[in-house]
Each structure stands twice: as C-alpha cells, then as structure tokens.
C-alpha cells in the first residue's frame, strides 16, 4: 500500500536522519537476533508464522527508532499505519514500511487470507483516498547468480 500524498526525501529526510537517536546496543542486539535466529531460519523452514512475527518485530523496532521523525508514529503515513494496524489486529501477517514509506506492506500466508483481508478493509472503510494497494506474489525460488560477459 502506498500513500501518494506522503513523501519523505530531500532536505526533510536529511534533517530527520541527523536528528535520529543513536541505536542502543539492546535494540541492535534485538534486530540481529530477530534476523539471524527467527527470520532466516523461518525462511529455510518455510515457517510463515515465525517469519511474519520476526519481520514485524524488526519493522516495529525500526518504527520506534524513527518515531519522532515520523510525527510520533511508526509509519510516515497515518493512512498506511491505519491499514497495517487494522490488518495486524485481524489477520496473521508480516508487516512494515519500506524505508521512510510512504509504502507499507503486509505479507499473508495465503491468497485466501489476502482476499479476506481485502474484503475486511473495504467493508470497514479502512481505505482512504490517495491510498493505492498493489498485490504481488513472492517468487518462491532461490537466488540466481549470472556471470557477466564483460
């Protein structure tokens, strides 16, 4: 989901980055632990629940770090934050924000869950004007390395 009305770049971004608090050793350790001991093993084990929880924990912690720069929110866009919050309260998802946003994301275990969530969002008038939803699928295959002919 992307809020076309909220952008964070240029001088505003530079000022915000300069004003961020230092990341504490505790938060840094938590980010490493979630990544190395939860997210990566969950990917290997195809354990959606652990993957989603770890990803969301990482995103929430990063949102705390950027909280003051984002007007007291873990999301730069209140509209995106509202959608993600509603989804997280009602569905098992992995969620977060890309960089400063305004793009947020929600990862679902199945297409059926996604369809239920889309119906829920429409039925409960959670979506606002200026918010665009894009639905994509995971590649579900490993990386590929190519040797350049250069």
Language-model segments: residues:
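Active-site rim beta-loop-alpha module in soluble metabolic enzymes
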Residues: 6-71
